[in-house]
Amino acid sequence: MMCGAPSATMPATTETQEIADKVKSQLEEKANQKFDVFKAISFRRQVVAGTNFFIKVDVGEEKCVHLRVFEPLPHENKPLTLSSYQTDKEKHDELTYF
């Protein structure tokens, strides 16, 4: 993967679900909404000064949210941050940079 360029979309892994779970409360607060279903479906990764994860999450009722989560470099010892999100997405919507 080239630094700065997002990877191809890949199926979600256990690590992807863990990342999504760690920012779920941030999303619920920002979106003013609770999600009973929260299952990562796919993701893209972008290496910058840290890593951006673009994650498509199934939130039930045929709807998805797209998350952009920033993971700082390990030596910075900082938590994951929900940088941005898109609601009212569907499973067929492409996961792109936002």
UniProtKB/Swiss-Prot annotation:
Compartments reported by the entry: Cytoplasm
Database matches in CDD domains: CY
Ribosomal protein found in the keyword field: no
GO cellular component: cytoplasm; cytosol; extracellular space; nucleolus; nucleus
Keyword Acetylation listed: yes
GO molecular function, one term: endopeptidase inhibitor activity
Highest taxon, organism lineage: Eukaryota
Motif extent (Secondary area of contact): 46-50
TM segment ranges: none
N-acetylmethionine PTM sites in chain numbering: 1
One GO term of the biological process aspect: negative regulation of proteolysis
Disulfide linkage: none
Keyword entries, A-Z: Acetylation, Cytoplasm, Protease inhibitor, Thiol protease inhibitor
UniProt-annotated site: Reactive site, residues: 4
Family of the protein in this entry: Belongs to the cystatin family.
Biological role: This is an intracellular thiol proteinase inhibitor.
Protein name from the UniProt record: Cystatin-B
Upper classification of the organism: Eukaryota, Metazoa, Chordata, Craniata, Vertebrata
